[in-house]
Regions:
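Residues on the lipid-exposed face of transmembrane beta-strands in outer-membrane beta-barrel proteins
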Residues: 11-15, 25, 48-52, 118-122, ...
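Outer-membrane beta-barrel translocator/channel fold
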Residues: 34-45, 49-112, 282
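Outer-membrane beta-barrel translocator/receptor signature
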Residues: 1-37, 41-44
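Residues that define the transmembrane beta-barrel architecture of outer-membrane proteins
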Residues: 5-9, 42-44, 110-116, 162, ...
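Transmembrane beta-strand segments that form the barrel wall of outer-membrane beta-barrel proteins
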Residues: 1, 23-35, 242-243, 268-281
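Repeated loop/turn-to-beta-strand initiation elements of outer-membrane beta-barrel proteins
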Residues: 20-23, 56-61, 126-130, 176-177, ...
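Outer-membrane beta-barrel translocator domains and adjoining extracellular loop/strand segments
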Residues: 36-42, 72-78, 132-135, 179-185, ...
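Membrane-embedded beta-strand positions of outer-membrane beta-barrel proteins
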Residues: 25, 50, 59-61, 166-170, ...
Length: 282
């Protein structure tokens, strides 16, 4: 429907390069036309992601972008276009929803946000040997009509046992809202500070958060029944607002220390206890 319908394009892709590395992307675009003039809405989301899972080094990362634009019409100019259409244009014109005059043109609200998230860790530990006994009845070992028992094979392999992890997590995010109108009727708003027939207003929020931690991992020996993690986090926030003269900027700092005690392995009991305390005022 090219008059008031909706359209959507959506795509997702993910691939494993090998047993350690993977990456992909996603796209989602939605467009709606609306039933009245200047009422269309569009929404666009897109992102890329990747991961690397090795014995010692592990990483996950994602970037996402979100954009939403909503055209505004301020409502119809006169309710009689709907309640008493015969009174409009001296009854010489029939109105449809897409031809009814509206209050605003070239006016929109736009929200745009993106974030980058990265978490990675480096694990220290030791290598130990594991022994596997291959069953003599395995298809690889079976010999038809053989009456002599075969000896079982013993396979010795090495596995990495992590003991301690050094962790870093980072998130960068920016969100912006913008209202713009290039064509307004005079007196549209009670208070006009700059221009009575045009508007331009925006608000921006920006933040960077870093978390550094060290973890003693669960299960590296029979006495390590739970994992213990200690961390420190710092977050920087910046806000930009418009006022009557210029843009005003506000900065904030947040600093926290915390810890986690968790048991995630086994079948009998699982628990997760977290605690943190702020040590810096905003």
């Amino acid at each position: 429907n090219k008059v008031n319908g909706e359209e959507r394009l959506k795509s997702y892709f993910s691939v494993n390069v090998n047993k350690r590395l993977a990456f992909g992307f996603n796209i989602d675009y939605l467009y709606g036309r609306g039933y009245y003039q200047n009422q269309s809405t569009s929404n666009f989301n897109a992102g890329i992601f990747a991961s690397y899972i090795g014995n010692k080094y592990q990483m996950q990362a994602v970037y996402n972008n979100f954009t939403m634009k909503m055209n505004e019409n301020g409502g119809i100019q006169d309710d009689r276009y709907i309640t008493r259409p015969e009174d409009m244009a001296e009854g010489k014109k029939e109105y449809e929803s897409t031809t009814i005059p509206v209050k605003l043109e070239q006016t929109s609200n736009k929200n745009k946000d993106f974030y980058v998230y990265l978490t990675h860790r480096y694990r220290l530990g030791f290598t130990r040997e594991t022994t596997t006994v291959e069953d003599a009845k395995s298809p690889k070992r079976a010999v038809a009509n053989d009456s002599v028992p075969l000896a079982k094979d013993t396979i010795i392999t090495e596995e990495f046992v992590p003991v301690t992890s050094f962790i870093h997590t980072m998130k960068v995010e920016r969100a912006r809202h913008k209202f713009s109108s290039a064509k307004e009727t005079e007196g549209q708003y009670p208070n006009a500070y700059f221009n009575e027939v045009a508007s331009r207003d925006s608000t921006t929020a920006f933040s960077v958060k870093n978390v550094f931690g060290i973890a003693l991992l669960e299960g590296f020996n029979k006495y390590a029944k739970a994992g213990l993690t200690a961390y420190i986090s710092h977050k920087f926030n910046r806000y930009e607002l418009m006022d009557t003269l210029s843009r005003t900027r506000f900065d904030e700092q947040e600093l926290f220390v915390g810890g986690e005690l968790a048991k995630r392995q086994g079948k009998t009991l699982h628990y997760n206890v977290n605690g943190e305390i702020g040590i810096m005022d905003k």
